[in-house]
Regions:
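ER/Golgi luminal nucleotide-sugar-dependent glycosyltransferases, focusing on the catalytic module
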Residues: 1-219
């Protein structure tokens, strides 16, 4: 059974390789010269300050309470939301978002998370140098889960220039026990795995990174 799954996985990779390779080579050019012309930019009711969050959403079934709750929580913590929407919004949903953001950009769903983040960063452009902190999140991240501000407090109270909430391949893969008390061995974090990376759904960057031209050029 495992062999069949592996064969199926390899076959799918083989079939999609030409498309993926084409996107890798020409995807940015295709978006910038064709798809980006259809994007729409709207000014929201929240003013711009020194903290900005690029909040990427894909409300295929409409805006949810969690979207609005997250936006309100971000505003409460002095972040100006730049909402990137990868799905066209009906008028009422658009109105609710604009009441709780600095800027709304509606675009084609091209490039997934990083395509949306790129849209926001290119829009900010020279403003990046004046931003104290920039957060990139998507709508798989919910705020607030509890009444504390652990995430924002951590960002504010540390001197770290880059913060990723979770990582992949940062810990060895093992079968975890069903109860925490049975976890006897410590999990040792290690970023040297060649597949190591921080998850894209919640990233934080300080002004030191934002004002470096290499950051903008990356996008």
């Amino acid at each position: 059974m495992k062999l069949l799954r592996e064969i199926s996985r390899i076959a799918k990779q083989f079939i999609t390789f030409p498309i993926n390779f084409g996107n890798y080579l020409f995807g940015t050019f295709y978006y910038d010269n064709f798809l980006s012309k259809s994007k729409k930019i709207y000014s929201g009711h929240i003013s711009l300050n020194e903290r900005v969050v690029i909040f990427l959403i894909f409300p295929e079934k409409g805006i949810t309470k969690s979207h609005l709750r997250s936006l309100k929580h971000l505003i409460k913590n002095n972040y100006s939301p730049l909402v990137i929407c990868n799905f066209p919004l009906p008028a009422q949903d658009q109105k609710e978002i604009l009441n709780n953001c600095w800027t709304l950009i509606e675009r084609k769903n091209y490039g997934y998370d990083f395509g949306g983040y790129r849209e926001g960063i290119l829009f900010l452009n020279e403003k990046l140098k004046k931003i104290d902190n920039l957060i990139l999140i998507n709508d798989s991240t919910w705020f607030p889960i509890s009444h504390d501000n652990t995430y924002f407090d951590f960002i504010e109270n540390t001197n770290l220039d880059f913060i990723g909430v979770t990582s992949h391949y940062g810990f060895p893969r093992l079968q975890l026990p069903t109860k925490r008390k049975d976890l006897t061995k410590p999990l040792n974090f290690n970023s040297k795995n060649r597949r190591f990376h921080y998850a894209s759904y919640a990233l934080s960057f300080s002004n030191k990174i934002l004002k470096d031209k290499s950051f903008f050029n990356f996008w």
